[in-house]
Amino acid sequence: MHQNLITRWLFISCIMVILMIIIGGITRLTGAGLSIVEWSPVTGLLPPFSFESWQVEFAKYKAFPEYQSVNYDITLSQFKFIYLLEFIHRLLGRITTLIYIVPLICFYFQGVIKKCKMLPYIIALLLFCIQGFMGWYMVESGLLNNHSVSHFRLAFHLIIAVIIYHILFYQLIKNYCDLLLIPSQKLLLIFSCISITVIYIQIFLGALVAGLDAGLVYNNFPLMGDNFIPIEIQDNLFNLTNLYDPVFMQFMHRLGGFSVFAVNAILVICLFKVKHLQLTKIAYFLIIVLLIQIATGIITIVYSVPIIIASIHQFVAIILLSIIIWCYFLFKNS
């Protein structure tokens, strides 16, 4: 009974975090992230309702660089759209946090979760708290002298969300999934760890690309212009200033994509070699997800970052990570 409660709670929490990640990505892609220029964790629970209230919020927005440099011709109706998108993102963050924290407190005091097993849940709780601050810290960077947020802060904001999901999903499969009765698979465990690491790096690079609008600089594949290494960075490939260069970031994200494919291709081969029915099914599922991820990534580049495809690309990255976390769980406990 208690096990089922924990499983349902973790499943819902995982879904909510995924929604947060996707809506956060859409917020970034639509340029809505800087539309709310204040951080009001308690008083900001309701959007403006009256015309006067909307005018007040619009006036606040006009005082900051994004309006003055980019959206100076935006109408009130257009402002309402981006404002409500950012509002939904923040509201969903509050709801997700409550969905996680309230049952956790109840489970702890009722003894449903034993004290010796609380550590990962406490870490996730702390990350939820840090995430709220990190979100505002990111937004604040776009309200100073720049009309866009720091791509580094954006990347860390995303990675914290992914780590939260990772912790919750791992606890979910520990509660729900059966172990495999197979011999120890150290090689598969090692490749699972490598794959998780490479996917994390690729997600981080993807956030840097999004933060710099780097998906727009080259729109052909597999080359960038007429070269594999774009001409702009050929002479200074290892310069630290490249971390602020959209061309370099798109190049690194492409390299990351090749790395993710290579590592997971090896993992798929290893899964087939075990000749276990469930691992074979996982291998086929991994192939499908990997191909979808590659296809959506290429389409995102070639068609100048269409919002729907880019959002699917981000979602599939989380699914890919989930499969590898599942593999890690199976091989760690084999």
Swiss-Prot record:
Listed cofactors: heme b
Keywords: Cell membrane, Heme biosynthesis, Iron, Membrane, Metal-binding, Oxidoreductase, Transmembrane, Transmembrane helix
The keyword Transferase is annotated on this UniProt entry: no
One GO CC term, this protein: plasma membrane
Enzyme Commission number(s): 1.17.99.9
Binding residues annotated for heme, in chain numbering: 253, 313
GO biological process: heme A biosynthetic process
Primary localisation category: membrane
Quaternary structure and partners: Interacts with CtaB.
Protein's UniProt name: Heme A synthase
